[in-house]
From Swiss-Prot:
Listed GO biological process terms: protein maturation
A Pfam family assignment: FdhE_central
Role summary: Necessary for formate dehydrogenase activity.
Single GO molecular function: ferric iron binding
Predominant location: cytoplasm
Similarity comment text for this entry: Belongs to the FdhE family.
Name assigned to this protein: Protein FdhE
Organism: Escherichia coli (strain SMS-3-5 / SECEC)
UniProt entry keywords in alphabetical sequence: Cytoplasm
Cysteine disulfide links: none
This protein's encoding gene: fdhE
GO cellular component, as recorded: cytosol
Subcellular location: Cytoplasm
Length: 309
């Protein structure tokens, strides 16, 4: 199954009625998203060996919250959605959508917000980014979108991505369309922007018990059935791993067909669990999965592979 974005005026009455049964897409709910993430990161930093880095990530998330409201985005995506729908492509496809200068404006605003909080190497990194040319910044963004992580140092990548993510989340939040599920391929990628997930979440509330993958760029969530590999869609050789017990709020779902894994977070076990923060705070589980020979099928926006990884 893939998920395709259908423009509002192209939906029939039956599609409008059924669209709400199992929502295939949950567009970004930006209100308090970054504040909630920052709070969760700070909470998880207590008694965590990665505490300093989690607090660093919390600073970036808080800056995203501030910049989000200081620099709103106005854009009409109606035409873009129609074109993408006709082509069967994500409307905000990272590989083809031209980037507006707005994202670099967001980056500079993030740097200004973060500067007073940074010192040492981190301060040097953002000052270096502040001095970079427009083309240099565009080249780094293109490299990240192409998964050419050796071309962007792992200390710069989180700042670049934070601005790109904010820009894409603002655009995704403006999409004036609905979504429906259609048979197809590549459901392992975000149907809105084509990026990869950071983790998956079994939710509570109106989507109780449903699993949604959370995009590491535009913050959209999309439905993928449980007990099926989110990477290759096979279901015969899945295994579930945790560091605690069977009731753990965080597990890794591994697939022996494709050799990858993705974390599953369970809101019913911990209502405060958060897709990015809890994934980052559970790197010990990633280390275990690597020891078992599995490759991660996702990337956390605060932790990019470095050169040679």
């Amino acid at each position: 199954m893939s998920i395709r974005i259908i423009p509002q005026d192209e939906l029939g009455s039956s599609e409008k009625r059924t669209a709400d049964m199992i929502p295939p897409l949950l567009f970004p709910r930006l209100k308090n998203l970054y504040n909630r993430r920052a709070e969760r990161l700070r909470e998880l930093a207590e008694n965590n060996p990665l505490g300093d880095y989690l607090r660093f990530a919390a600073l970036i998330a808080h800056a995203q919250e501030v910049v989000l409201y200081d620099h709103p985005l106005e854009m009409d995506l109606t035409t873009r959605i129609k074109e993408a729908s006709a082509q069967g492509k994500p409307p905000l496809d990272i590989h083809v959508l031209p980037r507006d200068k707005h994202w670099q404006k967001l980056l500079m605003a993030l740097i200004a917000e973060l500067k007073p909080e940074m010192s040492g190497p981190a301060l040097a990194v953002i000052e270096n980014l502040e001095k970079a040319s427009t083309q240099e910044l565009e080249d780094m963004a293109s490299a990240l979108f192409a998964s050419d992580f050796s071309s962007v140092s792992s200390d710069k990548a989180p700042f670049i991505w934070a601005a790109l993510s904010l820009y894409w989340a603002q655009m995704a939040n403006l999409i004036p369309g609905k979504a429906r599920a259609e048979y197809g391929e590549q459901r392992q990628y975000c149907p809105v922007c084509g990026s990869m997930p950071v983790s998956s979440m079994v939710q509570i509330g109106t989507t109780q018990g449903l699993r949604y993958l959370h995009c590491n760029l535009c913050e959209t969530e999309w439905h993928v059935v449980r007990v099926k590999c989110s990477n290759c869609e096979q279901s015969g050789k899945l295994h579930y791993w945790s560091l605690d017990d069977e009731q753990a709020a965080i597990k890794a779902e591994s697939c022996d067909d494709c050799g990858t894994y993705l974390k599953i977070l369970y809101q019913e076990k911990d209502p405060k669990i958060e897709a990015v923060a809890d994934d980052l705070a559970s790197l010990v589980l990633d280390a275990r999965m690597e020891q078992e020979g599995y490759a991660r099928s996702s990337i956390n926006p605060f932790l990019f592979p470095g050169e040679g990884e």
